[in-house]
UniProtKB/Swiss-Prot annotation:
PANTHER family: 40S RIBOSOMAL PROTEIN S15A. One of its GO terms (cellular component) is ribosome. It comes from Agaricus bisporus (White button mushroom). GO terms for molecular function: structural constituent of ribosome. One of its GO terms (biological process) is translation. NCBIfam families: PRK04034.1. This is Small ribosomal subunit protein uS8. Keywords: Ribonucleoprotein, Ribosomal protein. Belongs to the universal ribosomal protein uS8 family. The keyword Ribosomal protein applies. InterPro entries: Ribosomal_uS8, Ribosomal_uS8_CS, Ribosomal_uS8_sf. Signal peptide: none annotated.
Amino acid sequence: MVRISVLNDCLKSICNASRRGKRQVIVRPSSKVVVKFLSVMQRHGYIGEFEIIDDHRGGKIIVQLNGRLNKTGVISPRFNVQHNRIEQWINYLLPSRGIGIIVLTTSSGILDHEEARRKNVGGKLLGYVY
């Protein structure tokens, strides 16, 4: 398999395992961006616990699934978004109000769209989950 984006490969393997009814999935390789993205997903209840295993070859992440995941995606290229333009991207990417999250990388770290609006920070779009 050709690795285009580590984050994209991670989200696709999690989504495919969730569709097949699996309870856990092993994601390789790991990175800081993937771990922060998974922590945002965990905070919103889309996945269960995850464990990072350092095997000195890129690392692995074991993710526990809970069946709440419908679709995930990476936004490529990573568009710049001002804090007052986040609402337009919510309407474009998410199916309905209150369903799903958009994850951004900001100067305050990797946040979901609600936290970014609360803190009045913009950033680059990473992906979406619903």
